[in-house]
A protein has these predicted regions:
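Extracellular glycan-modifying ectodomains
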Residues: 1-204
Length: 204
């Protein structure tokens, strides 16, 4: 398991920047997908990782979302602030998902998947259900914007080898090794995220 610890019982470090906003748009997913289990921490960081408990990722995700939901319900004035939650942004790191077992992740893909039923291994339906369950029980109205299915088709829309690492664009040598360096998580701009924004604007 990678050394990633999530503090699931507090949003204090970030929430001070959210207070009083007219529109709040939340999302969280990729950083949770480091494995089947994740270290979760309650209370102080004083004990470091020794105070963390390894939980199934969906369980830790639910705990974190419940903490967020409690903050929204106790702090946000729904007469002033509109709250949105966008669902997971898919990753496309396994070309066998779309019928190319000998492919190189999303590298050199130039067209979307045409199968309307397509759902790759880069999106976790169990995590989607966690979002729906938590939001359904909130006192504050939260509009869930489902970007996942429409984004699943766009294996062609990632930055691929035209990306950066450590703040620098990939070198020619790095671009020549797409199996190692192709970025099939982030998206090109202009591109698919503009569609997400159009959906958001339609709700405003």
């Amino acid at each position: 398991m990678k050394k990633r610890v999530v503090k699931v019982d507090s949003v204090e470090d970030r929430s001070k920047y959210w207070e009083g906003a007219d529109i709040l748009v939340f999302n969280t997913y990729v950083w949770w997908m480091s494995g089947l289990r994740m270290k979760a921490l309650w209370g102080s960081f004083g004990n470091g990782e020794s105070g963390a408990e390894a939980l199934d990722t969906p369980v830790a995700y639910r705990l974190g979302l419940k903490t967020w939901a409690n903050w929204v319900d106790s702090t946000v004035d729904s007469n002033k602030t509109k709250v949105f939650f966008t669902t997971m942004s898919p990753t496309h790191t396994r070309s066998a998902d779309w019928g190319k077992p000998n492919g190189t992740k999303c590298f050199n893909e130039t067209e979307p998947v045409k199968d309307k039923r397509f759902w790759g291994t880069g999106s976790n339906k169990q995590m989607m259900k966690v979002v729906s369950s938590v939001v359904k029980h909130m006192a504050t109205h939260v509009t869930v914007i489902n970007i996942t299915q429409l984004s699943e088709y766009r294996i062609d829309a990632h930055t691929s080898v035209y990306t950066e690492t450590g703040g620098k664009m990939l070198t020619a040598e790095q671009r020549a090794d797409p199996m190692r360096n192709a970025d099939c998580i982030h998206w090109c701009l202009p591109g698919l995220p503009d569609t997400w924004n159009r959906i958001l604007l339609a709700h405003l």
